[in-house]
Amino acid sequence: MHIEARLFEFVAVFFVIMAVLYGVLTSMFATGGVDWVGTTALALTGGLALIVATFFRFVARRLDIRPEDYEGAEISDGAGELGFFSPHSWWPVLVALSGSVAAVGIALWLPWLIVAGVVFVLASAAGLVFEYYVGPEKH
């Protein structure tokens, strides 16, 4: 996780520098003075990246060294079980579609579509989580 932490630390520093630069340049060249919305958004983005980098640093301390962190690692060092993946599941597609229904409802401010989207998101997320908790005869 050291590489991921370094990556997010770089992103955090980049966004903080860009926030300062953006604030200075908008104060010099914009007619209304400093654009506080953009400056705040860039600064908060840098802060969020710093939070993620700090989390990765703490996780990296607790884990053993991974093949990704070891410079002399071979490809075969990363072989083995990585986890369970369901390649034929339609539930992620349904979660995305129901999330987009809810987002369109929010964008157009249609309360009935927001409620329908939230219900669809909850139902499809439950289907995704409990997909393999049903009996084998159900598949």
Curated annotation (Swiss-Prot):
Top EC category: translocase
UniProt GO cellular component terms: plasma membrane
Signal peptide: none
Localization in the cell: Cell membrane
Record-level GO BP terms: electron transport chain
Disulfide bonds: none
Statement: the UniProt record of this protein carries the keyword Ribosomal protein: no
Catalytic activity line of the entry: 4 Fe(II)-[cytochrome c] + O2 + 8 H(+)(in) = 4 Fe(III)-[cytochrome c] + 2 H2O + 4 H(+)(out)
Membrane topology: Multi-pass membrane protein
Transmembrane segments: 10-30, 36-56, 79-99, 101-121
Entry's EC annotation: 7.1.1.9
Segments forming a coiled coil: none
Keyword presence, Transmembrane: yes
Single GO molecular function: cytochrome-c oxidase activity
Keywords, alphabetical: Cell membrane, Membrane, Translocase, Transmembrane, Transmembrane helix
Family: Belongs to the cytochrome c oxidase bacterial subunit CtaF family.
Function as written in the Swiss-Prot or TrEMBL entry: Part of cytochrome c oxidase, its function is unknown.
Binding partners and assembly: Associates with subunits I, II and III to form cytochrome c oxidase.
UniProt protein name: Probable cytochrome c oxidase polypeptide 4
Lineage per the UniProt record: Bacteria, Bacillati, Actinomycetota, Actinomycetes, Mycobacteriales
Gene (name only): ctaF
